[in-house]
Structures are given as C-alpha cells and as structure tokens.
From Swiss-Prot:
Gene that encodes the chain: dnaA
Superkingdom of the organism of origin: Bacteria
Positions of the UniProt region annotated as Domain III, AAA+ region: 106-323
Entry domain remark: Domain I is involved in oligomerization and binding regulators, domain II is flexibile and of varying length in different bacteria, domain III forms the AAA+ region, while domain IV binds dsDNA.
Described function: Plays an essential role in the initiation and regulation of chromosomal replication. ATP-DnaA binds to the origin of replication (oriC) to initiate formation of the DNA replication initiation complex once per cell cycle. Binds the DnaA box (a 9 base pair repeat at the origin) and separates the double-stranded (ds)DNA. Forms a right-handed helical filament on oriC DNA; dsDNA binds to the exterior of the filament while single-stranded (ss)DNA is stabiized in the filament's interior.
Keywords: ATP-binding, Cytoplasm, DNA replication, DNA-binding, Lipid-binding, Nucleotide-binding
Signal peptide range in chain numbering: none
Protein name per the record: Chromosomal replication initiator protein DnaA
Amino acid sequence: MDAWSRSLERLEAEFPPEDVHTWLKPLQADLRVDSLVLYAPNAFIVDQVRELYLARIRELLAHFAGFSDVFLEIGSRPRPVEAQNAPVSTPSAHVSSEPQVPFAGNLDNHYTFANFVEGRSNQLGLAAAFQAAQKPGDRAHNPLLLYGGTGLGKTHLMFAAGNAMRQANPGAKVLYLRSEQFFSAMIRALQEKTMDQFKRQFQQVDALLIDDIQFFAGKDRTQEEFFHTFNALFDGKQQIILTCDRYPREVEGLEARLKSRLAWGLSVAIEPPDFETRAAIVLAKARERGAEIPDDVAFLIAKKMRSNVRDLEGALNTLTARANFTGRAITTEFAQETLRDLLRAQQQAISIPNIQKTVADYYGLQIKDLLSKRRTRSLARPRQVAMALTKELTEHSLPEIGDAFAGRDHTTVLHACRQIRTLMETDGKLREDWDKLIRKLSE
C-alpha cells in the first residue's frame, strides 16, 4: 500500500463517510519521488480539499512518505506513457474553462433499496424514491421531497435512488450535495466571479440530490440561485430529489416562491419507525456486521430505543463492540447491562409531563385542560391522544398513566388507547396529528 492509500485510509477513519465520498474519493493521486499531485474533477473539490483537508493530508504524508509537498490540479491523472514523455514542471492549481462535476464519486454505494428496511412509517417514501429512480424527471414525482426528523432514512432513500439511476444508466450524471455544500460552492463562485460557470455545472446534471434544504432558510442569495437551478432542471425534465427536516411550508425564512416550487411534485413524510420496523432494522444491521443478535435482544433495543434509526445503530454498535472486547455472548442480560445508561437516557427524554406539554402545545391548549374533567370534543380527543402516546412511548402501566391524568381509572386509559388506534385507521387528520407528535417527541 503506497503512502497516499495509507493516508486516505486514515482520512476515512477520521472524517464522516459522506464527506470522504464527496470530496476525497473523486481525487486521483500521482505519487512522485518527493511530492504528491492530487487531481480533482472540478474547482469545487479543489477548494474544499484545500480548505478542509490539505493540512491533514500533508501531516499524514509526512508521516508515511517523509515529505509534505502536495499540489492540487484540476483534471485527470496523466497516463504513464504520457507522464514519461512529458516535461517536468512544477504543478500548480489552475481552473479549466469548463470543469466537470464529479458525478460518480459522491454517491455512497452502500445505501441501496435492497438494504433499506421497509415499514409502515417509510413505505410511501420508499415507493416514491423507487419510482423517481425508475422514471427520473417524471412530473408525478419531480421534485421528490422527503421530509422528517433526523436519522429516519431520508438520506438512505436519496442515495438509493441515485445509485439505482446509475445502475440503470452508468453514464447518468447524478450529483449529491448537502445544502451547505451548495451554499459554499456558491459563495466561492461569487468571490471568484465565476457564477456563470457555477450555474452551468449544476444545470448539466441528469439528477440533482440535495440534503437538508432547511439550511437555505434566511439565505436569500442562495435561495435565488437554487430557485433558478430548480427551474432549469425542472424545465429540462431532470430529476430533483430533496430532503428537509420538516414540511417546507413550516420552515421560516424559506421564500414563498421556493415553497411553491417544492409543492409541484411529490412530498412524502418519513416518520419514526414503529416497533416491528425497529426490530427488523436492528436484525438487518446486525447481519450486515456479521453479528449474532438473538431476537429477544433485538426486541429489547426496539422497545427501548424509539426515536430514530441512528440511535438503534448506535445501541447496536455499542453492544457488538463490548461483546467483541469482552468475548461475552450477546444475551438479554448482557444487553441490559451494556446499554443501561443509554436506555435510561432514552426513557428520561420521553416523560409523561413532556408528552402532556407537547400535546397541549400542539392543540393550542394548556396542560390543565388535558387534566380537567371537561369532556368537550375539543378537549377529549387531545386528552385521548396524550394518553395513547404515553402508553406507546413509555413503560408506565395503565393505572400509572391514569394517575398522571388527574386520577383517571385505568379502564379510561385503555379505552382512549383503543379509540385512538381505531380512529386512525379511517381518520387521516388524526393519523397526521399522531405522526407529527411522535416526530416532535422523538427529536
């Protein structure tokens, strides 16, 4: 393994995977006797590598190769024959008139539709992303907006769609960016007076995937440039897939015209996974790691960790790491011992007072209204929702929940839980309220 490969291996361990795939994987290395030349597909990557990674690359190169001279070039690494005949010159960064966007190196190939665990909370999002990948640019799902809390699988679906497009058409120009990367690229273009080039680079793609567009809020110039990019891609029938941490109309600081454009296609909420999906996710992630996890341990984690997929993965990573270190088998007792602090913190985060306040705020009530004896519909339904959420999200018994709601009988709590479950099968608004409250309480 040469010095660059060893340096890249260390960088992969130190930086987030999505950053490595976006900025470092597209680089082509030309390792010379006393220097390293890194070739990047475009000026964006040169800028990001110079600002964020170059100092660390030089440190690693000094350690592995004994020198720290690193030069950044835009273009492709010369072929060996050409390199032998080419005159020796000092490398320097230069910008070609039309640098190309790195269409292959910024998609994480690990995330596919095949390894996405489907459940009631995400099945519509999965279907929408799959359709967007099968028929990119179709007005029925262009743009496709996936929204929901952190760690629920939005980015997984986005990567899966991009990877499926490239699998179907290896020449497809699919570009993934986080919103702050779009912002940084635009700022750099403004500083260097290369906005025309910036616009051309983003408008030549077949599919543009941007994560976390709530970051655009309050950034007027960024929204303006994205608005024009959006229009050009939409008119050209190029697929746009976006994610947001909430429904865009709820994002303050996002321009009305941009919110209107986002409503042109399909917007799908990704909700926190239910118990069955959480258990399936734990078992699937364990299989990916080659770990043996008994079903009862997966059920324990799924029951206690209710917020998002990342928390489930974190619990699983902690469990398998300690099992490997100690050589102990993963049992229910071992899991409870290992995850004790994590599970306690999770339970403390979702308490009865927290649920009562969240429900009261959502329906424009006060907590005392939920606890009162009044039975008007405007109070009874939110009260039932709060009781049902408490049963769903905590370990409290029915009598304990009744006590917390002004000493109500446990049969009242049971009736509330059954009533809400039954109504949600036919009442779309109630289902929407329930999902939003789950999301708020899981944040």
